[in-house]
């Protein structure tokens, strides 16, 4: 007789008040409430929104396509996420599989509002969700976003992240 493994939770904690997951996460009402999620960032055009009372939705309408323009959505999305956190809430960022789009947005947030380099921010996301892998187009946009943040002195030009 084989042992059956429990299904992994639909979302994982990346950092305080920041979670990443797949589309099933939005339907996990009890888990959303328990985690203190107040904002769900739905990085998709088609996936359903959250079903938990008191949980707001911000939709970032992009497909998981390297040609999609995610970059223009990063500043307003990260600002909304930070506002939710400053109000005492937590954010869940999700897309269909919790792999590319949501990973890119979580990485951008960690750069913009936690001061991490692109490499360090993505390492944090990947540690929380091992399947995380932004597509090549999103990765290039994250590199451009990092350069923009460095030019604005939001991020240091030389990484200061501990090894």
From Swiss-Prot:
Record key words, sorted: Hydrolase, Protein phosphatase
Function: Has phosphatase activity with the synthetic substrate 6,8-difluoro-4-methylumbelliferyl phosphate (in vitro). Has almost no detectable activity with phosphotyrosine, even less activity with phosphothreonine and displays complete lack of activity with phosphoserine. The poor activity with phosphotyrosine may be due to steric hindrance by bulky amino acid sidechains that obstruct access to the active site.
Assembly and oligomerization: Monomer.
EC number: 3.1.3.16, 3.1.3.48
Keyword Membrane applies: no
Ranges in coiled-coil conformation: none
Active site: 95 (phosphocysteine intermediate)
GO molecular function: phosphatase activity; protein serine/threonine phosphatase activity; protein tyrosine phosphatase activity
Catalytic activity: O-phospho-L-tyrosyl-[protein] + H2O = L-tyrosyl-[protein] + phosphate; O-phospho-L-seryl-[protein] + H2O = L-seryl-[protein] + phosphate; O-phospho-L-threonyl-[protein] + H2O = L-threonyl-[protein] + phosphate
GO BP terms in the entry: dephosphorylation
Protein family (similarity comment): Belongs to the protein-tyrosine phosphatase family. Non-receptor class dual specificity subfamily.
Protein name: Dual specificity phosphatase 28
Residue ranges occupied by any Tyrosine-protein phosphatase domain in the UniProt entry: 10-151
